[in-house]
């Protein structure tokens, strides 16, 4: 009935879909197992992709040949580039998406891949023989053989949904929890924990008075995540902004005694940076209002996602409070918000390839590793899919460095530091933000992915054309001289110091408030030259030139870090015998077993003096 698969992926959320796509596109025969074929790639929470640091991750997935960027672009209903008022290291693309079309596009792309098969059933266990994963066991008792297994169970492992004093098993509203896998893994020696996340109520957009809210349009310059030429929408749907008030807070407080968060019924750790509305009121009691975003769920639906109002309070309290919000006086609720508790496995139990240390051929990706967010999950899925394929084909694991991508930062943080609360990516977590911009993910990663057989020849050719174009633009600007007569009027308008003699144009470009776009308006020859190039390629060329000195400094730091990465630690190194190491360092080093001195230096509890001791032990 079943072939023997190279890779079996359990769970078809964002992590599972990217894992299946990556392994299949590299040539593995893949089975994607899900409890419900109709919920493949479902956006369980907000109908949006990207955002601060997350947008960079989606672009990195796309640069590697993953599908999240393409699907996001095809299902986009609004685009915004966040943080444009800050430097380019902080610019982060974000899309509002049609929830239904997003899932449809993902399923269509997977179904068009001849290397992907599907099976709909609850998976209750992994078949493990001689310390190696070699298949899965279904609820009907069927065993399906596989050379590797990727677990991407999301919030389904012993999921428990809370609404006020009510609680019931489920992995998502209206769907069953997954039973059996946690218990088996614990029996194999894995440590597990509990985490919690939440979602807001869904509202009927026909009952909202938008005149009492603030409209938030998308950017006029619509862009996408994908480096491929995806057709983008000609129009956009606006979001809206409203605020809570003291009356709303007072009503919400009446339900605190029935809140599972406050009465101790929820044991799992919740996301620090995405608190529920009741948590915000409790923690920030000095605030008399909190901002809410009214987000449409798609082109052809009236359903509204109310971002910022996540709650597990009783449904009657949620409803009463909503009706006190400006614009919501007559609002109807489609379903209440809820909190969900689920099992996760501390990610320090993984290798940097996302393969488990205890069971060969078993990989974890997504919320099972303690992360939160579609983008974080999708990126882990891609890494796990790549490495499951590499394991089966007896190739070296792929490990993205911290200096190569936000995905590298994410995985490195998880494995070396672990997490006791849902981990979310921020730009502040990356030490090389100027190197890891959203505009250059293809320059950083597409060549690597092409060599692995993941990024297509078409992507590679586009990358080569972009690099050549950027070099041409930069060379033209470096060679072009401008006189005081040509440029001083422009400089005066932007309150920049006038020229006293002729200079090369790159010296002017380095100044604040100066860009290729506004320079083109006063230098016709520049305007003619750049008119033949892509706007985004021009922007990348400009950023590289304007921030050249800072970028070079970051590259020098990366070089120093890479020297530590190149010092391998012996697999048989006995940390107990290094008596000068601190007790905490010995404990952490034994737990994580770092492969390199660089990795050891980033482990929480390992000090610079401990690193020096390791260097001596390695004969350096």
What are the functions of these language-model segments?
Residues 377-398:
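Internal hydrophobic alpha-helix adjacent to the cofactor/substrate pocket in enzyme cavities
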Residues 4, 21-125, 140, 152-172, ...:
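Conserved N-terminal/central alpha/beta ligand/cofactor-binding core
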Residues 10, 143-154:
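Short hydrophobic core segments
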Residues 429, 435, 446-612, 616-620:
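Extended, charge-enriched "interface" segments that sit outside catalytic cores
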Residues 305-371, 399-412, 534-588, 593:
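A glycine-rich dinucleotide-binding beta-alpha-beta segment and adjacent secondary-structure elements
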Residues 36, 54, 182-319, 327, ...:
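An anion/pyrophosphate-binding glycine-rich loop and adjacent beta-alpha core
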Residues 2-15:
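Beta1/beta-strand and adjacent pyrophosphate-binding region of the FAD-binding site
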Residues 127-143:
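Conserved beta-strand-loop-beta-strand element in the redox core of flavoprotein oxidoreductases
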């Amino acid at each position: 009935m079943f072939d023997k698969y190279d890779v079996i992926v359990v769970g078809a959320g964002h992590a599972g879909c990217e894992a299946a796509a990556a392994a299949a596109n590299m040539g593995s025969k893949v089975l994607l197992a899900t409890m419900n074929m109709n919920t493949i790639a479902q956006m369980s929470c907000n109908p949006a992709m990207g955002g601060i640091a997350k947008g960079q991750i989606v672009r990195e997935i796309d640069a590697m040949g993953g599908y999240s960027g393409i699907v996001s672009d095809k299902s986009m209903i609004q685009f915004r580039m966040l943080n444009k008022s800050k430097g380019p290291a902080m610019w982060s693309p974000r899309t509002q998406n049609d929830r239904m079309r997003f899932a449809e596009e993902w399923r269509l792309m997977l179904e068009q891949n001849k290397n992907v098969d599907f099976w709909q059933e609850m998976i209750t266990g992994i078949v493990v023989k001689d310390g190696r994963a070699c298949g899965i066991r279904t609820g009907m008792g069927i065993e399906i053989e596989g050379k590797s297994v990727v677990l991407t169970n999301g919030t389904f492992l012993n999921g428990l949904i809370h609404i006020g004093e009510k609680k019931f098993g489920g992995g998502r509203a209206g769907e069953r929890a997954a039973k059996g896998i946690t218990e088996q893994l614990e029996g194999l020696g894995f440590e597990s924990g509990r985490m919690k996340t939440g979602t807001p109520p869904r509202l009927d957009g026909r009952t909202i008075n938008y005149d009492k809210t603030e409209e938030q349009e998308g950017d006029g310059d619509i862009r996408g995540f994908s480096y491929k030429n995806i057709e983008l929408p000609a129009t956009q749907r606006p979001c809206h902004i409203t605020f809570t008030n003291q009356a709303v807070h007072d009503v919400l407080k009446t339900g605190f005694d029935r809140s599972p968060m406050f009465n101790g019924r929820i044991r799992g750790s919740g996301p620090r940076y995405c608190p529920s509305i009741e948590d915000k009121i409790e923690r920030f009691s000095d605030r008399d209002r909190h901002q809410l975003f009214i987000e449409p769920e798609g082109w052809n639906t009236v359903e509204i996602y109310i971002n910022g109002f996540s709650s597990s309070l009783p449904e009657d309290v949620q409803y009463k409070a909503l009706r006190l919000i400006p614009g919501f006086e007559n609002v109807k609720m489609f379903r209440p918000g809820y909190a969900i508790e689920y099992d996760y496995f501390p990610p320090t139990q993984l290798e940097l390839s996302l393969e488990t240390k205890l069971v060969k051929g078993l990989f974890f990706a997504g919320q099972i590793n303690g992360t939160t967010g579609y983008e974080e999950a999708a990126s882990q899925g891609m890494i796990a899919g790549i490495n499951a394929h590499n394991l089966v084909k007896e190739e070296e694991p792929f490990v993205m460095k911290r200096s190569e991508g936000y995905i590298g930062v994410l995985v490195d943080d998880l494995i070396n530091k672990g997490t006791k609360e849902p981990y979310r990516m921020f730009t502040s977590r990356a030490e090389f933000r100027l190197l890891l911009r959203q505009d250059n993910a293809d320059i950083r990663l597409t060549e690597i992915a092409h060599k692995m057989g993941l990024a297509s020849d078409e992507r590679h050719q586009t990358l080569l054309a972009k690099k050549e174009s950027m070099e041409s633009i930069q060379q033209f600007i470096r060679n072009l001289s401008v006189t005081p007569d040509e440029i001083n009027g422009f400089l005066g308008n932007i309150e920049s110091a006038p020229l006293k003699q002729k200079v090369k144009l790159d010296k002017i470009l380095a100044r604040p408030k100066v860009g290729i776009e506004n320079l083109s308006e006063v230098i016709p020859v520049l305007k003619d030259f750049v008119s033949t190039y892509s706007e985004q390629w021009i922007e990348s060329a400009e950023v590289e030139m304007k921030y050249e000195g800072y970028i070079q400094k970051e590259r020098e730091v990366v070089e120093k870090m890479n020297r530590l990465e190149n010092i391998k630690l012996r697999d048989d190194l006995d940390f107990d015998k290094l008596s000068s190491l601190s007790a905490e360092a010995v404990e952490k080093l034994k737990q994580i077993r770092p492969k390199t001195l660089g990795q050891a230096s980033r482990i929480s509890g390992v000090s610079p003096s401990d690193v020096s001791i390791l260097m001596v032990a390695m004969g350096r």
